Each structure stands twice: as C-alpha cells, then as structure tokens.
Amino acid sequence: QPRPDHSLRVPRPDLTVKIGTPNACNGCHAHKTAQWAADQVAQWYGPQRRQESHYGETFAKARAGQAQAAEALAKLVADAQQPAIVRATALAAMRTDGSTAMSTRIDATRDAEPEVRAAAADSYESAPAAQRLYALAPLLRDPVRAVRIAAARSLSSLQPGQIDAATRPAFDAALAEYVAVQNISLDMPGAHLNLAVVYENT
C-alpha cells in the first residue's frame, strides 16, 4: 500500500515492537513476529542499526494521551530537519490549549515551509476571535495559495464586524480563492460540504 507521503522507508521492525507500526519485513514473513524481525535485523547489521528516535514514537505518545506528548510534538514542529508533512502533522496533533501549544502555533505561522504555515492556520480555527485574527491576518497575503485559503477558512466563522477594514480586502480575496478551489471539485461531496460550511459562516 502506498504511503501518503510517497516515501520509501527503511524497515524498522524495532518500531513495530515498540508502537505497533507495520514494517516491510513482516509483510513477507507474515508467519513470524515483529520481535523475530527486529532480532534478525540486529543479528545481520548490529544491534545499534537504526535505533535512533523516530517521529512515529512522538505520534504514538500523542495518540495515547501521554502527559509528555505536548513537549515532544512542539519539538517536532520546530525541527526544520524533519519533512514538512511530519511537522504539519505534529502541529495538527497538538492540543490547542496551553502555553506550549500557543507559542508553537504562532511560530508556525512564520515557518519557512508553506505546509507548516497552512497547518498553523488550520490549528487556529477554534481560537478566540482576537487571537485568531492577530495570528492569521498576515497569512491572508501569503505567497502560497494553500496558506491563504487555509487562513481564510479559519477566519470565515468570525462575525463581519470582527474583521477590521484593513484586513477585509485580503480576507475577501483569499476566501474567494477558497470558493474557486472548491468549485473546481464539485463532483466530490467534500467540496459541497466545504462550501456549505463557508456559506453558513459568512
């Protein structure tokens, strides 16, 4: 089965043992356990092969609701050495309350990677109006359309009077872009739902 991020991964049966992720070894050796595969890899390549920390462990902590997950996710979002899709996913996995989440989100709106900026815009969807507008108004003029429309979508539930006159033209333009993108995909139910939400909000 193809991965959503299109990557080809080095098998890590040790991670299967730790957090239950699939691995290519047991795809063929289905009658064997993940521990057997991890032991074989250690026997062939040495016990230290690919034992470094993996971002999958951070996501596993978050999904299990572990207390230390917030700090681990924040570090992952801030790690520019990680792929943008991983950092954006970490941002989406963070709870939206708490000082760690707040500082991580505002930093992410200024990130060099558009995928991370778009995820930051999405993360503000339920934030208080003033906080949301302060963080997302600059993204309405982002050079990347995906970021602009993510910001417009998150701001669309604000009351008309909550968007100041200086921001209104950029908001209207970005929201029009979002509607145009949905109109391209009207053969898909999701586009109709997205438009319905925006029209209800505005």
Q: Where are the predicted features?
A:
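Short, solvent-exposed linear motifs at loop/edge-of-secondary-structure regions
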Residues: P22-T33, L136-P160
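Primarily the internal scaffold of c-type cytochrome electron-transfer domains
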Residues: Q1-A84, A92, P143
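Composition- and surface-driven signal marking solvent-exposed, interaction-prone regions
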Residues: P2-L8, A38-G46, T89-A90, R105-D107, ...
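Short coil turns that connect the paired helices of HEAT/ARM alpha-solenoid repeats
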Residues: A78-P83, T109-E115, L140-A146, I184-L186
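Feature representing long, continuous alpha-helical segments
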Residues: H6, N23-N26, E71, A88, ...
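Amphipathic alpha-helical scaffolding segments comprising HEAT/armadillo-like alpha-solenoid repeats
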Residues: A67-A78, G98-R110, P128-L140, G161-V179
